[in-house]
């Protein structure tokens, strides 16, 4: 990879981080949080709801997939399905990665067989198993940003929930460069 390519990729990643910061602010997400809550909050500002749910995916298949599903036109939603038997940490990563596809505006592939789900309402799915493409790298970058500082939040507990304590938690428990 040439120096120019590295520079271009770094610029693209910086642009992606700025866009993600803006989207998360609009959704009211100011600090690291659980990916299911991120989905819930993003649903408030996204054109359709974003729902993450555990699912019994085949063991030899992907750990997660994203489906845009509309059994009825007014009931359209984006479903992020993740492997039910994966560890909780892996589930968080899978949801963050699939959110990366959603937030990145990645196109859906045609659905061929979703025998476990009523296929008549599905308009497409994201089914990829390789990180070699631009969209996979972009989704992984978004996942990394979403999860990058989440662990810092878990170790800080406060005696109360007033504004000073909240500020103290932000200052001591979370780095400014989280996003």
Describe the residue ranges of each PLM region.
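Short secondary-structure junction/hinge motifs that connect adjacent elements
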Residues: 30-45, 52-62
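Generic hydrophobic secondary-structure signal
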Residues: 50, 80-82, 95, 99, ...
């Amino acid at each position: 990879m040439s120096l120019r390519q590295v520079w271009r990729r770094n610029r693209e990643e910086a642009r992606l981080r700025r866009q993600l910061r803006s989207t998360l602010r609009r959704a009211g997400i100011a600090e690291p949080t659980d990916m299911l809550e991120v989905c819930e909050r993003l649903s408030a500002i996204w054109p359709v709801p974003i729902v993450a749910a555990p699912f019994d995916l085949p063991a030899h298949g992907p750990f997660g997939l994203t489906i845009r599903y509309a059994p009825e036109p007014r009931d359209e939603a984006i479903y992020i399905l993740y492997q039910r038997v994966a560890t909780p940490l892996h589930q968080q990563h899978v949801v963050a990665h699939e959110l990366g596809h959603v937030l990145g505006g990645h196109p859906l592939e045609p659905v061929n067989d979703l025998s476990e789900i009523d296929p008549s309402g599905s308009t497409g799915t994201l089914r990829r198993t390789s990180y070699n493409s631009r969209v996979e790298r972009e989704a992984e970058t978004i996942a990394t940003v979403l999860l990058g500082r989440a662990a810092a939040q878990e170790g800080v507990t406060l005696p109360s929930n007033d504004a000073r304590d909240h500020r103290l938690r932000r200052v001591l428990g979370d780095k400014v460069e989280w996003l």
